[in-house]
Each structure stands twice: as structure tokens, then as C-alpha cells.
């Protein structure tokens, strides 16, 4: 799956988990919106979630994921695995084109429609067309500075916005 039009980044440092997403929505080669909100808090404010891909599909997945969080008592790991299983096996969900990046204070997961739940090795992860740029910048800042998680997300997202034509610098940031 190839997703244009977004960058979502999460960084964890010193007990802070911070997620940022750009605001650009692109249709083909046209920017339709510059201030979309692709990052939100779920699970009574204890879980961060961001999406790359179709907005309508992502809203469906946010709803399903939040239901899984409730079903599993806020257990992010179990909710992520159960959503991925449903996403892979459900006839309707299988057609949804999006990726989810979810995190709490302890865990970070990328959830795909292929039934994959990926937990990164580091305290950072990113999805979307600008994800590789944001992730590279975040890793460099994590390794070489004492910046807070929020400052790293802000700086890395700005760098991604300078490089990726499908990412703007109108950043929405949430933290737990």
C-alpha cells in the first residue's frame, strides 16, 4: 500500500509519549486541506492514535480500535492485536486503506490491514509518505540531543514538511 498526504510520528522519552501529525490532505496533485487533524487521544486520554491513508477508512478504524480498547480494559497490546485480526479477516474491513500508529506510555505499535502489528525497536515510529524523513530526524535527535519528546516531534515533523511534498508544517501534537 502506498499512502500519500501525511506524516505521523511518535516519540517516547523520559516518561513522555508524544505524537504529531501534519495537516495536509492531498487528492492527486492538489492540496484539498491544510489543517486536517490526523492525531487524537483515545481510551480515556491514555492512548495516542494517528493515521495515514483514507480519512473515511481511518475514522472507521479509530472507532473499531477504541471499541477494542474498551473491550480489553485499556490494554493497548491486546487491543492492537485484536483489531489487526479483525481487520485481516473481516470482509468489509479488509477493503479499508489506512495504517494506524498507536502508542501509550509503554508501547508503540504500527497496525496494518495485512494483520501486522509492528512494535519498533526504538522509542520512535512513523507512518505515511513523510514518515521515513520524520523518523530519521527523530532518531538523530534522540541519539544526539537532550531535547524533550515534544521538541523532537516538533523539529522532526518540520524537517519532514521541508522534504515531503505531501506533508505540510501545520502540525497537531498530542501527548500522554
UniProtKB/Swiss-Prot annotation:
This enzyme's EC code(s): 3.4.25.2
Subcellular location: Cytoplasm
List of residues binding Na(+): 161, 164, 167
Xref: PROSITE patterns: PROTEASOME_BETA_2
Swiss-Prot/TrEMBL catalytic activity: ATP-dependent cleavage of peptide bonds with broad specificity
GO biological process per UniProt: proteolysis involved in protein catabolic process
One Pfam family linked to the record: Proteasome
GO molecular function: metal ion binding; threonine-type endopeptidase activity
Enzyme class: hydrolase
Catalytic residues, chain numbering: 6
Protein activity control: Allosterically activated by HslU binding.
GO CC term, one of those recorded: proteasome core complex
Principal subcellular localization: cytoplasm
Keywords: Allosteric enzyme, Cytoplasm, Hydrolase, Metal-binding, Protease, Sodium, Threonine protease
Family to which this protein belongs: Belongs to the peptidase T1B family. HslV subfamily.
Function: Protease subunit of a proteasome-like degradation complex believed to be a general protein degrading machinery.
PANTHER family, sorted: ATP-DEPENDENT PROTEASE SUBUNIT HSLV, METALLOPROTEASE TLDD
Assembly and interaction partners: A double ring-shaped homohexamer of HslV is capped on each side by a ring-shaped HslU homohexamer. The assembly of the HslU/HslV complex is dependent on binding of ATP.
The protein's name in its UniProt record: ATP-dependent protease subunit HslV
Organism listed in the record: Thermotoga petrophila (strain ATCC BAA-488 / DSM 13995 / JCM 10881 / RKU-1)
